[in-house]
Amino acid sequence: MRAGLLEGVIKEKGGVPVYPSYLAGEWGGSGQEIEVKSPIDLATIAKVISPSREEVERTLDVLFKRGRWSARDMPGTERLAVLRKAADIIERNLDVFAEVLVMNAGKPKSAAVGEVKAAVDRLRLAELDLKKIGGDYIPGDWTYDTLETEGLVRREPLGVVAAITPFNYPLFDAVNKITYSFIYGNAVVVKPSISDPLPAAMAVKALLDAGFPPDAIALLNLPGKEAEKIVADDRVAAVSFTGSTEVGERVVKVGGVKQYVMELGGGDPAIVLEDADLDLAADKIARGIYSYAGQRCDAIKLVLAERPVYGKLVEEVAKRLSSLRVGDPRDPTVDVGPLISPSAVDEMMAAIEDAVEKGGRVLAGGRRLGPTYVQPTLVEAPADRVKDMVLYKREVFAPVASAVEVKDLDQAIELANGRPYGLDAAVFGRDVVKIRRAVRLLEVGAIYINDMPRHGIGYYPFGGRKKSGVFREGIGYAVEAVTAYKTIVFNYKGKGVWKYE
């Protein structure tokens, strides 16, 4: 892989590039060296240096004592200019960023390029976040207690925000969390996934080159357990976390009383009504299952089709999944690349076996093709047994979904709402009355009509209910989690309260 922006920052050791952490002012780290393996062939492609406990302490101290003020005191127009310049830098280096995403995250080239472009767009649209920063004026005329007073309500940055990012969008998620934290005047400490931390390092370098205050950002390459010290630290006022529900619950337990954006487990249901365009539904559902090998929180995991169209629908979805080419993502003809690790394939195969043992039938795929490669899979599940299956009860982060024939919309809604997650749902059909009923009753954060769920750059807000998280991400919507209200009350009663000159 090319060093790109990090040339001069990366050192080589035994022919392997070594990426440092960024410690709120300097690149470095004296902790352990952690191997970074490519999911393509499990070869070591880099190492990252984690900071020592003392370096973490010093970094948080810099962010808290200086960095949060550097970010807050920088005029909003200058913050916006920094983010726009960073977008230009990333865009100029698109090929290098995409190459790293292919090698480190195992994304097919087209998906990697798409993620880089999404990061660029997110940075350029930061000005839309500013539309949500306004406050309120409250006259005190309406209660005896507040007569001759008035109040102003304003939003202020919290200080230091911890951005904990997942492996599936290692560039975009880092850029997104940094963007909305910084545009509102916060300093940011980024803890990337240790599976693919390289894109986040490149993003931080682009931001620094664009003029980001050097003491207002940090990148700490820490394994999960060691990262708890960031979350638990009282100098960190908010945590923006994307990852599994289990880890998210641990983050809240360790972090205690502070503000959180939690984008957690998902896996979405897709409901197909009897009057749906079946070609459209099959196309969207298949793509929702296999895109980035199903390693997306908004991937389709449960297909619920009304009885008159069920047979044709699952036949078409199975046909599309069976036609996909699985393999090395560096090959432009490949549709589906590897899962992030062999253990992810193990989990998928165990879930398929569990489904078959409980009455399920594999309609497409179902075979392991290598340590990290697997066929996209559709499993037919009886309506009266599906709730017992791992595929229903848990989010299996892989290209696999179960399909259930339902007698009507109400049964579909009941099965969709029965899962512990509530991120998104898709509904395919033409009957406006039925669609409106689904919109009202589905317990999810977003509903996509005649489309697959896809959060994209967050142009529309996203986030879930139940075990899928709290608060929302998306342009302008994370303001709730990374700022605080401050109320200022003016008293005009009595003589000598105000001096007029």
From Swiss-Prot:
The keyword Ion transport does not apply. One of its GO terms (molecular function) is NADP binding. It catalyses: D-glyceraldehyde 3-phosphate + NADP(+) + H2O = (2R)-3-phosphoglycerate + NADPH + 2 H(+); D-glyceraldehyde 3-phosphate + NAD(+) + H2O = (2R)-3-phosphoglycerate + NADH + 2 H(+). It comes from Thermoproteus tenax. Keywords: Allosteric enzyme, NAD, NADP, Nucleotide-binding, Oxidoreductase. The active site is at E263, C297. This is NAD(P)-dependent glyceraldehyde-3-phosphate dehydrogenase. Belongs to the aldehyde dehydrogenase family. Beta-D-fructose 6-phosphate binds at R72, R79, Y184. It comes from the Archaea. AMP binds at R72, R79, G134, R154, R155. Optimum temperature is 96 degrees Celsius. High thermostability.
